[in-house]
Amino acid sequence: MQRQNFRPPTPPYPGPGGGGWGSGSSFRGTPGGGGPRPPSPRDGYGSPHHTPPYGPRSRPYGSSHSPRHGGSFPGGRFGSPSPGGYPGSYSRSPAGSQQQFGYSPGQQQTHPQGSPRTSTPFGSGRVREKRMSNELENYFKPSMLEDPWAGLEPVSVVDISQQYSNTQTFTGKKGRYFC
C-alpha cells in the first residue's frame, strides 16, 4: 500500500527531485527504469503474494492432478491393482467359485429344467403341429389357399377415367362411385 506513491509519481518525485521538469521527466524516464519499479511493486504484490499463492495452489492442484493422472491412482486403478488385482482376484477367487457353483448348479438346472423343457416344447410342439395341421385342414378350405387376385387383368387409365365419368353422369352423386 506504500507503493500508492507510485500512482502519483509526479507530486513526490518531482518535489524532491525538483531539478525541474527535466528531472521529473528523468524520473518519468526512469519509470522506464521505473518500469522495473511497477514490476517491483507488481513483483512485490504479484510474485510474493499472487504467484506463491497461485503457485502453491497450482502445486496442490498439480500435485492432486499429478497423483490422480500421473501415477499412483490411475496406474493403480487402471494398472496392476484394478485390472490385475481386482478382476484377477474376483475372477480367480469369486469367479472361480462362481464358475464351480455355476457348473454344478448349472448342470443340475440344465438337466432338470432342460430335459422337461426340451421334452415339452419338442414333444408338445410336434403334437401341436400335427393337431394344428389337422385343424387347419378342417378349418381352411383348399380354395382359400388359392390366390383370389390371380384372374385379374391390368386396366388402363383411360378405362378408369371413363368408368368414373360414367358413374358421375349416371348417378349424379359424388359419393356413389362404387355403387
Swiss-Prot record:
Polar residues biased stretches: 110-122
Compartment(s) of residence: Nucleus; Cytoplasm; Cytoplasm, Cytoskeleton, Microtubule organizing center, Centrosome
PTM annotation: Phosphorylated during mitosis in the cell cycle probably by CDK1.
GO cellular component terms attached to this protein's record: centrosome; cytoplasm; Golgi apparatus; intracellular membrane-bounded organelle; midbody; nucleoplasm; nucleus
Subunit structure: Interacts with PLK1; phosphorylation-dependent.
Biased composition (Low complexity): 60-71, 79-109
Keyword rRNA processing: no
UniProt effect for mutating residue 104 to A: Has no effect on interaction with PLK1 in mitosis. Partially prevents phosphorylation
Pfam family, one: MPLKIP
Keywords: Cell cycle, Cell division, Cytoplasm, Cytoskeleton, Disease variant, Methylation, Mitosis, Nucleus, Phosphoprotein
Residues the record lists as Phosphothreonine modifications: 51, 120
Modified-residue entries (Omega-N-methylarginine), positions: 57, 117
Keyword Cell division: yes
Tissue and organ distribution: Expressed at highest levels in liver and kidney; intermediate expression in skeletal muscle, pancreas, heart and placenta; low expression in brain and lung. Expressed in epidermis and hair follicles.
Residues recorded as bearing Phosphoserine in the entry: 40, 47, 72, 80, 82, 93, 104, 115, 124, 133
Disease per record: Trichothiodystrophy 4, non-photosensitive: A form of trichothiodystrophy, an autosomal recessive disease characterized by sulfur-deficient brittle hair and multisystem variable abnormalities. The spectrum of clinical features varies from mild disease with only hair involvement to severe disease with cutaneous, neurologic and profound developmental defects. Ichthyosis, intellectual and developmental disabilities, decreased fertility, abnormal characteristics at birth, ocular abnormalities, short stature, and infections are common manifestations.
Chain positions with Asymmetric dimethylarginine modification: 37, 59, 68, 77
InterPro entries linked to this entry: MPLKIP-like_vertebrate, TTDN1/SICKLE
Residue numbers spanned by region Disordered: 1-135
One GO term of the biological process aspect: cell division
Role: May play a role in maintenance of cell cycle integrity by regulating mitosis or cytokinesis.
Protein's name according to its UniProt entry: M-phase-specific PLK1-interacting protein
